[in-house]
Amino acid sequence: MNSKILFLGAVMMLPTFASCQQEKPFPDDAVDKVYEYLPEWQAGYLDIHQISTGRGNAAYLIFPDGTTMLLDAGDLGVHTGTQEIMNAVPNDSKRPAEWIVQYIKHFSLPLKNNGAIDYALLTHFDTDHIGQNGKLAIEKVGLDYKLTGITHVGNLLDISTLIDRGYPTYDYPTAAKVTGAHISNYKLYVTGKVKRMKGL
């Protein structure tokens, strides 16, 4: 009786071992095309680009009608904790915003808009989404704010409409949750942008 149970148990385990030993499928042709450039955007297509700088989140979208959107533009800066997570991509010869702008200008060529962004949407106010305000944030004469993340992108490219979750009071979900030097820097950028739009 015990030998029958043992045999039955061994037979039942065979499919498990067989599935673990499956041959890998034939190589996909797409694998050989990894280093080819993505095709240019065409009217009627939706292009979604995740831009990896190794320093924060950024995504660039071109909608079927040619409308463009940037989702976040983070800049964690360069410090030990950041480098333990991921190296700067493609390298640290430029700031994250400069890599983002270079990427956008390349893929927006069919639009003939010099990389202009119709909408920039910030999902939330963490540094990996809007930029940090540490020693690596760039100070520029004549600006009330430092260049980092979205403020740096906005200084290099035209952003028509900026969408965030707090304007104008920045108290969502509570004012205490929307604090920090990086947020103060971002608010200065927004204030300056609003003044310029109003011609003040």
Residue ranges of each PLM-predicted region?
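Conserved beta-strand hairpin/beta-sheet module of binuclear metal-dependent hydrolase folds
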Residues: 39-119
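Histidine-centered divalent metal-coordination motifs
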Residues: 124-129
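Flexible, acidic/histidine-containing loops and adjacent segments that form or flank the divalent-metal
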Residues: 22-47, 53-54, 103-106, 112-119, ...
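Sec-dependent N-terminal signal peptides
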Residues: 5-14
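N-terminal secretory signal peptides that target proteins for export/translocation
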Residues: 1-2
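C-terminal motif of bacterial Sec signal peptides marking the signal peptidase cleavage site
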Residues: 16-19
